[in-house]
């Protein structure tokens, strides 16, 4: 009998803790964790492009135009299928296009929106930049951080459906978490309660 596919998409604001939630689900609940941002970073490196948010946005939009709005979800599910019996399911961080949220729902999955106070998020990003090999990518002022986030929340005028639209993703989410605490145990308890794990 085929094992039922469990799929969770994580979306939210920058520095809210999407990767932390993904890692908790992987380590404590047996999910395969895939960071969509890491997939895009690898592609930027393969193309010899600077790993900057603008290039990652460009690559993701290009893939969506060429391969469909749910392409990043399909890539993650393909990774899970390589060794499906080993995992509970797949959890993907950084869903930033409504087509990705729709694709997660097509699979019967759950979309989770994670947020935190903007200053808390900015401080997290700055504190973790070097440890995550993103010092150059994340070296921004608070104002630049907020401006980049705003650019990713709405399709710009004249943009198309392949572009980032965080607000439309948020509108498609099933579960909402606030992660203002630095305590991972608090976050883990919130995840377990919200997802009924």
Residue map of PLM features:
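Conserved phosphate-donor/acceptor-positioning beta-strand/loop module used by diverse small-molecule
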Residues: 93-94, 104-129, 135-140
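Walker A/P-loop
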Residues: 19
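P-loop (Walker A) phosphate-binding loop of NTP-binding proteins
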Residues: 13
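ATP-binding Walker
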Residues: 16
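ATP-dependent small-molecule kinase phosphotransfer cores
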Residues: 32-91, 95-102, 131, 143-147, ...
